[in-house]
Amino acid sequence: MARVCQITGKGPMVGNNVSHANNKTKRRFLPNLRTVRVTLEDGTTRKMRIAASTLRTLKKQNSK
């Protein structure tokens, strides 16, 4: 499935655009996906599309 984080499964959400006149139209909020190379536990590297928030969490966990 497109536009989904391959680790957490985060995907698009639905919300509204709200104008100054308070008119509401549907819109989609897309996750901030980044294509990065991830080193797996067995030592192989793999390209994955992950959300920026997931990337931040992974960097924080690996620094400990």
Curated annotation (Swiss-Prot):
InterPro entries: Bacterial_rp_bL28 (IPR050096), Ribosomal_bL28 (IPR026569), Ribosomal_bL28/bL31-like_sf (IPR034704), Ribosomal_bL28_bact-type (IPR001383), Ribosomal_bL28_sf (IPR037147). Keywords: Ribonucleoprotein, Ribosomal protein. This is Large ribosomal subunit protein bL28. The keyword Ribosomal protein applies. GO terms for cellular component: ribonucleoprotein complex; ribosome. It holds the Pfam family Ribosomal_L28. The gene is rpmB. It comes from Campylobacter jejuni subsp. jejuni serotype O:2 (strain ATCC 700819 / NCTC 11168). NCBIfam families: L28. One of its GO terms (biological process) is translation. The keyword Ribosomal protein applies. SUPFAM superfamilies: L28p-like. GO terms for molecular function: structural constituent of ribosome.
